[in-house]
């Protein structure tokens, strides 16, 4: 009985060590920072032409200033991860995607919606929208291929 117990204990210890190594590898290695500013076309591309579905994002913050000078920010990590994961079932998944779709809209204060601040109900007229044209916007975060 002692030999079996020692074997099971050894396997358990090895598995725990492997899980710890995998956790450290995923959380502390391979993350590359990115930063886009107002007017940039935001394109995420895999370095080795692999599927964009394997790209993951972390700590992605969209920050913008409204026409009154107030600073607003929203965490868009989940949005970007879901956009990338959406390519999983594609027959020929691309190696890049551009924020804003096919029109490749440059980063601006409307790239992500913060309800009550820059949504359609709040910015209701063309005059309101023109006030937003010179507002600064940034998108920062970390990205990696898994």
Swiss-Prot record:
Coiled-coil regions listed: none
Compartmental location: Host membrane; Virion
Gene induction: Expressed in the late phase of the viral replicative cycle.
Gene Ontology annotations for the cellular component aspect, listed alphabetically: host cell membrane; membrane; virion component
Chain segments annotated as transmembrane: 7-27
Keyword Transmembrane: yes
Membrane protein topology class: Single-pass membrane protein
Keywords recorded for this protein, A-Z: Host membrane, Late protein, Membrane, Transmembrane, Transmembrane helix, Virion
Family: Belongs to the asfivirus E146L family.
Name this protein carries in UniProt: Uncharacterized protein E146L
């Amino acid at each position: 009985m002692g030999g079996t117990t020692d074997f099971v204990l050894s396997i358990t210890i090895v598995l725990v060590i492997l899980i710890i190594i995998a956790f450290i590898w995923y959380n502390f290695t391979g993350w590359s920072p990115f930063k886009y500013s107002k007017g940039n076309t935001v394109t995420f591309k895999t370095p080795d032409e692999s599927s964009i579905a394997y790209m993951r994002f972390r700590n992605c913050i969209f920050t913008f200033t409204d026409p009154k000078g107030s600073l607003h920010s929203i965490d868009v990590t989940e949005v970007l991860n879901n956009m990338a994961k959406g390519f999983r079932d594609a027959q020929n998944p691309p190696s890049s995607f551009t924020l804003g779709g096919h029109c490749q809209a440059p980063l601006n204060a409307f790239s992500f919606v913060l309800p009550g601040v820059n949504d359609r109900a709040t910015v209701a007229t063309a005059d309101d929208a023109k006030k937003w044209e010179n507002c600064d916007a940034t998108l920062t975060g970390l990205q990696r291929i898994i």
